Each structure stands twice: as structure tokens, then as C-alpha cells.
Amino acid sequence: MKNNNPGIARTAKGHLLVDEHDVRKVVEYARSKAVELAVVGPEGPLEAGLSDGLIKAGIPTASPTQSAARIETSKSFMRNLLHRHKVKGTIRYKIVDNSRDLEAALDDLGMSVVVKPTGLTGGKGVKVVGEHLMTKQDVLAYGEEVFSKRIGGSAQIVLEEKLVGEELTIQAFCDGSTVVPMPAVQDHKRAYEGDKGPNTGGMGSYSQKDGLLPFLTRPEYDAAVKIMGDVIAALKKENAEYRGTMYGQFMLTKDGPRVIEFNARFGDPEAMNVLSLLKSDFSKICERMADRKISQKDAVFLEKASVCKYVVPEGYGTKSLAGEEIKVDEKAIAREGALLYYASVNENDGRVYTTTSRSVGVVGISDHVDAAERTVERALRHISGKIHVRHDIAKKDMLDAKVARMNRIREGPQ
């Protein structure tokens, strides 16, 4: 790991502080420790080919190869894959690599669109017309910035039709053929309350005890899972077998779930929701993914609701205050019945300091979302510093508004 994360350092028998994109050093360390099973967490190392390096070294790995991980690392590859295989849930899109083609694509799709650099941007490169970009000139200016600066590592943009509905996440364990879905989760990308402000990697998330969401029906959940299975099958047909955790982000529309994106890994923060509820042995699940032997009975979850809220540095989403000490009373948080997960922080001489990314995730578990949310809020009182939290996540008023909005969409013009 790059940062000295106190949670990981405390849990692991050994760890190496290294750039996680350095495939050679990570593989050498894994071999020196006789590692018997590997899981690659972040998307950057997947793009760098870390899974491939581990597999080549003879280490079973429950994460996709560089080729299969393109469903996340290349938005153009993902969209074209869905189009080639006629996967349900695909949307209208255009792929462009210069300003003239971008303007032509805008003329074709109209201004109700989303602008995405094709490569990895940590969830912060997506711009929605009407929210982040107000005019055609704004879109062209942002496009020129992407092309000239190679934002996301490539001078290419995917222009997508803007979807109307509620976003949701379904994650699944995959072994190349079988898809074992987890409870649905809803993340909140915007930095500020009321879903305002810049996009972030995710400020918090929640799940219900029935594995659904307040606005999501069982048939709609099943339809989204079917899409994920079709994507796994499509990758296999193109000799890019997918073994590992898959993250599907969907927009629930009046016509059912539509694909926003796929991640070749767990979602962050959504992993904290589902793994906090997992009753089964996670290491056994990973073994079975790596060995192509996963089945539905391998993953059993508590029938509980969960809420996660992220503590982030002041300025996160625009210009984070890095290097600031935050005080975390772990014992008091445990007494409140909450779980604590350190994220992108550095520990030095027993003190915890912020980086430019998210700092600490706090999770509450209960029979109902509102009770889990209250647990998190009590625990948050025991974390202090120059920090920011979205306190509105999973509040009853917010959830009621989402249900009402989805009902209006379903009942609207067909």
C-alpha cells in the first residue's frame, strides 16, 4: 500500500509501503511471503496488470486480468462490448477524440448528455450537462481540456445520453461463468448535502435488510443481475474471462435498469456495506472465484440494513486539506455499536493524518435503515478535525423523497 493505513497495518501480519502500481515489487513481495491467494483492490493496479503478474507467478488471484478489467478502465471498451453483444440496458453513446467530432456528437445526441473521459479519473472526471456544464461551449471547452491534458490517460471522450431515475449499485462475486449477487446499495457521489457540489469517489451509502432499496423491486433487481451475467458471458466470448468481484452501477428508469458503468472490483464505499453483512468466509469465496467454482450458496449475508458515511478532509472534491491531523476515538465508536474503516490516511507516531482523498468510513448495522443511520451519527461525534461529512445520507426524508421521485418517473409519459 502507498499510505501507512493504520487499519491495514494493524490487521496484517506484514505489509509493504510501495506504489501499488509497481507490479514487479508487489509480485516479488507476494512471492517472498509465500502468498497463497491474492485480491487486487484498486482499479489502478488492475489497469497496470497486477493480477496478470500474480497469476503468472503462480499465485491464485480473485481479481480480473488487465484485459477483463477494461470494463472499468476503458469506458469506450465497455460501451462497445455491450453494443456488440446486444446486452440489455445499454444506452445511446458516441466516442470522440477531437473537438470537431465532439461537436457533431452533440448535434446528434442533443444537450441532454453526460461527458466522460474514457479512462480512470477516480470518479471525478464525469460532467453532467445542465449541472456541471451549462452550455454547448462549456462542453466543448471541457472536451478540449480532456483532449489536451489527456484526462484519464487518454485523449478520448465517451458522450452518453443522460438517464433519468435513481442510481443503484449491485456487486457480485464472479468466477468466469457464475454470478453471485450481493445486496443492492445506493451510493451518493456528490460532495455536499442535497446531492449538490462536485462528483467524488462516494460520500456514503446504505442498504436494506431485504437486499433491495426503498425504490427498487425484486424484478428490477433481478433484471440488473441478469445484465451483469450477460456482461460476464460477453467477456468470456471475447477471451477475457472475468474472475473476481464485479460492480455494476445502474440507473433505474421507467424502462428498468440501464447501465451507468462497471467497476472491476468492489465499490468504495459500497464494499463496507456488504462485507460488514457477510456471514460467509470471505477468503473461501475468493478461493472459489479464483478456482472457477463459485456457487450461490457460497455467499450468505445477514438480513440487516447498513449505513456508511465517509469522513473526508475539508475541501474534498475540489482541493482537499491534506496532512491535517484527525482524532479518532476508536473505543468510543465501538461503544456506539458502529464499525470503523480507515481509508486514505497516514499514521505517523500514533497520529492519523489526512491525504487528499477520503479518510474514515463509519458503518452502522441494524434491522432498519433509520436505526443504522442513527448509530453512525452517534459514532461520528467521536471523530474530529478539519473534516466534512454528508449527514443527510440515509435520513428518512431523503429516502422518502427518492421513493416519491421514482414513483413519479414510473407513472410519467411512457
Model-identified regions with their sequence ranges:
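A conserved helix-loop-beta module that forms one wall/lid of the active-site cleft
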Residues: 55, 62-125
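ATP-binding N-terminal substructure of ATP-dependent carboxylate-amine bond-forming enzymes
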Residues: 1-66
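Internal nucleotide-binding/catalytic subdomain
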Residues: 127-269
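Active-site "cap" helix and flanking loop/linker of ATP-utilizing ligase/carboxylase catalytic domains
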Residues: 223-247, 263-337, 347-348
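Short acidic-hydrophobic, aromatic-tinged amphipathic segments that line or gate anion-handling sites
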Residues: 14-26, 92-98, 129, 134
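Generic C-terminus detector
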Residues: 346-349, 353-414
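Short amphipathic alpha-helices in soluble, non-transmembrane regions
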Residues: 143, 322-326, 373-380
